[in-house]
Amino acid sequence: MKNYLFEVCTNSVESCIAAQEGGANRVELCAGIPEGGTTPSYGEIAMAREVLTTTRLHVIIRPRGGDFLYSPVEVKTMLKDIEMVRQLGADGVVFGCLTTNGGIDVPVMKQLMEASKGLSVTFHRAFDVCRDASEALEQIIDLGCDRILTSGQQATAELGIPLLKELRERANGRITLLAGCGVNEKNICRIAKETGIQEFHFSARESIKSGMEYKNEAVSMGGTVHISEYERNVTTVKRVKDTIESITSSL
């Protein structure tokens, strides 16, 4: 019987609680989900650690949205955030850095890896926009990362099945492949069967309406990018359970 592991991408303490109740083995805590995930606040991390009593806590270290080419000041920020995360008792960190030509920024990654000693390290989906997946795989293995979160360099993990399978075969147990992006209760079995990957990353989120009675929908807090202030996406226990059970029930 295969030992599957399920990581839920959470955007709040509320979502962390739902992930744990739904049976997740691990959460990746992020702020700024519309930007692909940014470093959450001190308070959010501290509270997540408090409520996650049976589920491992990994925290994204990403100072901003956009590309993965970081300035010296941003790297210093990431180093300080790693130390903060360590002090708050997280089990792991999630980061990734690229060079101008789409390669792995090995010197910067070495700094971050040194700061992360004793923590589990996931190289995140910066991998999916790197120039050469095979070369990047070897570099990330050499750096000592524990896993790579990837959609197989496609818009979703389901579309990336061919590369995910190839990467798992190339890795040959030297690093864990964590399939993520668009993974849900409808496709997780197919992804597992066709790639042989055993770790999965998904959000299991649903949109919920705001409790606000008074609403001024003429104003957006996001400038020209309009995201409604009167609804938000949260992880739900049901969707976490449904996703996990859709694959475990087939064993």
From Swiss-Prot:
Keyword Nucleus among UniProt keywords: no
Keyword Cytoplasm in record: yes
GO CC annotation terms, alphabetical: cytoplasm
GO MF terms, alphabetically ordered: copper ion binding
Gene3D superfamilies: Copper homeostasis (CutC) domain (3.20.20.380)
SUPFAM superfamilies reported in the protein's UniProt record: CutC-like (SSF110395)
Name of a matching Pfam family: CutC
Keywords: Cytoplasm
Cellular localisation: Cytoplasm
Family indicated by similarity: Belongs to the CutC family.
PANTHER family: COPPER HOMEOSTASIS PROTEIN CUTC, COPPER HOMEOSTASIS PROTEIN CUTC HOMOLOG
Protein name, UniProt field: PF03932 family protein CutC
Species of origin: Bacteroides fragilis (strain YCH46)
Organism taxonomic ancestry: Bacteria, Pseudomonadati, Bacteroidota, Bacteroidia, Bacteroidales
